[in-house]
């Protein structure tokens, strides 16, 4: 009887400690709001692409950006090491893989799994503005 009471007390304290830790971690994460119209876009090493960091560090791990493709931008065939999630805000993100082509427009969502070979680009007249989230460090590795 005493043993089960002690086990119950230890379990309860462990749960409470865990909840306090999670609560503290959540408290330290601020709400983030960034308007795509007010975001600070910076050119990237990929000509025709600019990005505005929203959270995380795209050079080190999970991150999110607003990304712009200039009109007619062509990324060529490539892969990303990590999963990428995209929601188009303006223009059209053009996507192609072995299954076919997609014109991803405003309000549309696209998930590209890490290691999946694909082509992407911007609409010839409007380009593309999209929210992009990555599960790890950003990379774009050319593929044949």
How should each PLM-predicted stretch be described?
Residues 1-10:
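Bacterial N-terminal signal peptides that target proteins for export
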Residues 9-18:
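Bacterial N-terminal signal peptides
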Residues 17-61, 144:
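A short, N-terminal "cap"/entry segment at the start of jelly-roll beta-barrel domains
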Residues 51-53, 64-66, 85, 101, ...:
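Conserved hydrophobic/aromatic beta-strand scaffold that supports enzyme active sites
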Residues 58-59, 98-116:
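Short acidic-glycine-tyrosine-enriched beta hairpin
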Residues 59-80, 113-117:
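Conserved short histidine dyad/triad with adjacent acidic residue
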Residues 70-73, 80-98:
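Glycine- and acidic-residue-biased ligand/ion/polar-headgroup-sensing regions
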Residues 114-138:
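Ligand-binding loop in jelly-roll beta-barrel domains
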């Amino acid at each position: 009887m005493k043993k089960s009471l002690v086990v119950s007390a230890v379990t309860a304290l462990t749960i409470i400690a865990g909840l306090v830790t999670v609560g503290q971690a959540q408290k330290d994460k601020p709400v983030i709001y960034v308007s795509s119209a007010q975001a600070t876009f910076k050119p990237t090493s990929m000509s025709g692409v600019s990005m505005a960091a929203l959270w995380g560090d795209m050079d080190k791990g999970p991150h999110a950006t607003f990304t712009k493709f200039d009109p007619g931008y062509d990324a060529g065939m490539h892969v990303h090491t990590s999963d990428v999630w995209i929601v188009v805000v303006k223009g059209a993100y053009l996507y192609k893989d072995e299954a076919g082509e997609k014109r991803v427009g405003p309000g549309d969502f696209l998930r590209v799994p890490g290691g999946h070979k694909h082509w992407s680009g911007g609409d010839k007249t409007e380009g593309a503005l999209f929210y992009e989230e990555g599960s790890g460090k950003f990379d774009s590795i050319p593929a044949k």
